[in-house]
Amino acid sequence: RRSSDLLIRKILGLANSSHSIILDFFAGSGTTLHATMQLNVEDGGHRQCILVTNNENNICEEVTYERNKRVIQGYTNSKGEEVTGLTKNNLRYYRTGFVGRNRSMQNMRKLVNLATDMLCIKEDLYTEQNTFGGQKTYKGIFRYFDNGKKQMLVIYREEAIDELVDIIYDLDITQPIKVYVFSPSEDPWEGSFDDVSDKVELCALPQAIYNTYRRILPKKKDAVVMPEDDALATTQKDKDLFDGMLNFTDEEEA
């Protein structure tokens, strides 16, 4: 194992940037991530590593993840020696999932939740806040992420834009907030954000997410999914919200 670690570290060291993002589609035991973290220690770099693998014979959960968790936290090796952890690193674990093809509230909500995780990875921003400018965030309407260095606002309901723009207008910010809007159209919404154009950076949804969202978004002419068909659309409140009757005070808090 040591020889493979050294080889991968040498290969990674050939890259010019100490802020590279390394993608390994054949993660195996996680040697690439281990080597990345070790190389960062050696040269003060800030490389990031994404591992992708299946979980055949539980290798991802029991080997790949466990190995790198221990590398970060510290561990005792086979000789009984204490190995100091590479504690300036962190590790996140995601599982893929399937979203049904049928147009329904359930599939739409599942997609936006999963897609938001992907946006967090894209922006390298994971710290979710439960308020935005004094307004509580609400599940299914908008979510807000802020790690003290950058901010991201993800809007699921177009009807919320005007109120959120009013909130942004009154904010004193040092850099633009990245804004994503889930919408059946590719409208970037510049017009709606004109008054706060200096405070936001409107971001297009990745094309794959946008295409999937359009495919499963219930059409307005479709009958509202009934509770027995959709476990997440169980109340009149849900159906009212879906039909455009936005009400911040009634929607379930995130």
Where do the model's predicted regions map?
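Accessory, often C-terminal, charged low-complexity segments
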Residues: R1, D5-I21, V41-A254
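A phosphate-binding catalytic loop at a beta-strand-loop-alpha-helix junction
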Residues: S20-L39
